[in-house]
Amino acid sequence: MKQPGPNETRVYVWDLFVRIFHWTLVVCIFLNFFYTEAGEKPHEVLGYVAAGFVIARLIWGFIGSPYARFSKWFASPRTVYLYLKNFRTREIYTSHNPIAGWMMVFLMLCVLSLGLTGFLLGTDTFFGEPWIQDTHKWISNIMMGGVALHVTGALYESYHEKRNLIASMVHGYKNK
């Protein structure tokens, strides 16, 4: 890990709950997409764990530590526009940058939508209903595209900012 330079300070950004949330989602999504069988109990349990963690994270986004709060990193469309317009000389954010903030919202909405469609598939009314199954699969594939963009963005920003963003999601600290 890069040590803070003479003009940098180390900041505790990602609290324990945020990091547990993040890595729990990584495991649940990875296992459900690549290993478990749709409709089987492990797939359901992992899906409900992921959806439950997203609900808890939404609550934490209002009452949690300062960098966990949506008010700290949820950007207006104008802020996103200015960020993209000045992409080469853009500001470096301690928390999520404007694009990453919107990506977090997108991924959380995907997980909640998967939880809802997965739940519906387990009900008598919608069990085996093709349009719900297709919607569930469609959302899953779109979410995995978002995950790929998220990982690519984190790697790119780690290179651009010269600080390991993935490691910060392990130990919680970023150099500012």
Could you describe each region identified by the protein language model?
Residues 1-176:
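Membrane-embedded alpha-helical bundles that constitute the cytochrome b-like, heme-associated redox core
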